[in-house]
Amino acid sequence: MQDAITAVINSADVQGKYLDGAAMDKLKSYFASGELRVRAASVISANAATIVKEAVAKSLLYSDVTRPGGNMYTTRRYAACIRDLDYYLRYATYAMLAGDASILDERVLNGLKETYNSLGVPISSTVQAIQAIKEVTASLVGADAGKEMGVYLDYICSGLS
């Protein structure tokens, strides 16, 4: 896992250069948004269960996946879905704090799509639920922080699609 600082420094180091104006601007932007990201992460952490519950109610609860024969029909499958959505929210929060999506590739997306396809988990329903997480989160943390968090939730959706 990297953070925005490490990514900028590593890029300059590989090239054997000092940080240029563009690199400094990236660092300034990262530091300027730090308080916003920390506040958002605090709100998300305190409300994670509610965020996931509301997102499921908004996107999956009365869909085909929750009906008998659907992919979330048994209690065990439903619990696994909730667990996965909580996992995505947690890792997207880590990525937002770091200002870098690399943790999502390493810990979430690497092999996930293939695993879901082999298990018959409907990717479109998962993406729909993640989009609902994005909406619920934005309503709790505000527009600016919601936009920042949305970058990482969208990243997960893109990786699954």
Curated annotation (Swiss-Prot):
Main location: membrane
Mod. after translation: Contains one covalently linked phycocyanobilin chromophore.
Gene3D superfamilies from the UniProt entry: Phycocyanins
Record: residues binding (2R,3E)-phycocyanobilin: 81
Keywords, in A-Z order: Antenna complex, Bile pigment, Chromophore, Electron transport, Membrane, Methylation, Photosynthesis, Phycobilisome, Thylakoid, Transport
Positions of post-translational N4-methylasparagine modification: 71
GO biological process assignments: photosynthesis
Membrane topology note: Peripheral membrane protein
Pfam families recorded: Phycobilisome
GO cellular component: phycobilisome; plasma membrane-derived thylakoid membrane
Assembly behavior: Heterodimer of an alpha and a beta chain.
Function: Light-harvesting photosynthetic bile pigment-protein from the phycobiliprotein complex. Allophycocyanin has a maximum absorption at approximately 650 nanometers.
Protein name from the UniProt record: Allophycocyanin beta chain
Source organism of this protein record: Synechocystis sp. (strain ATCC 27184 / PCC 6803 / Kazusa)
